[in-house]
Amino acid sequence: RQKLWRWENFPEDNQPMTADLPASLSMYPEYTFVGMELYFSPEGIPTIQVDHPMTRDPDMGLLKPVDFKNSGWMPRVLRWWDDVNHIVAGRLTVTNAMTWWRGCLDLAMQLRSYDKLMVDVYERPQFVHDLLTYLTEQRCRWWGAYSEYFGLKLKPTDIGDDWLNVPFISPGFFRDFVLPRYLEIETFHAGIASIHSCGDQTPLQ
């Protein structure tokens, strides 16, 4: 019904109507994987935690390793996957739509806040490198566990990094802090299929 409604109301949407059922609870599960709270209003508007302990204190010890089965919403995600498959009973292909899409910069901005992360670049650049490296490593570990759990092969990945645009960051910041992490993701997945941001990426290319 959702796909038919989308087709009827958004004719310019060129996404194919496939005979499968995505098992999804919402967008933004990655924030919960790294310890942030995520809430939705009755209208479906998300609110992401802005007062994580790391927002106040640039201490890497405040972050715990991500556990594929137990971190954040993952227990709910996996229960939902099992429940949907039980209901469908093989009549449709069920796809897991709750994946780690967000990039390292997006998560770092949410953990520290934009203003504080930009100050960190000048006052404690090694901390910024460590934070982005940690988030990238956790993302890759999560995808490795995801592929093993669902019996899938790793493939080129998509990345959503809303702050990956000028003037919020400079080409120099991207080159020195973010690009090395993207290259690690590219190596791990054997490619990057697409990168989404909410602004102008052209000066970064």
Feature annotation, model-predicted:
Residues 1-46, 93-94, 183, 190:
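N-terminal basic, low-complexity leaders that serve as flexible interaction/assembly modules and, when applicable
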Residues 25, 46-57:
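Active-site beta->alpha loop and helix N-cap motifs at the rims of alpha/beta catalytic domains
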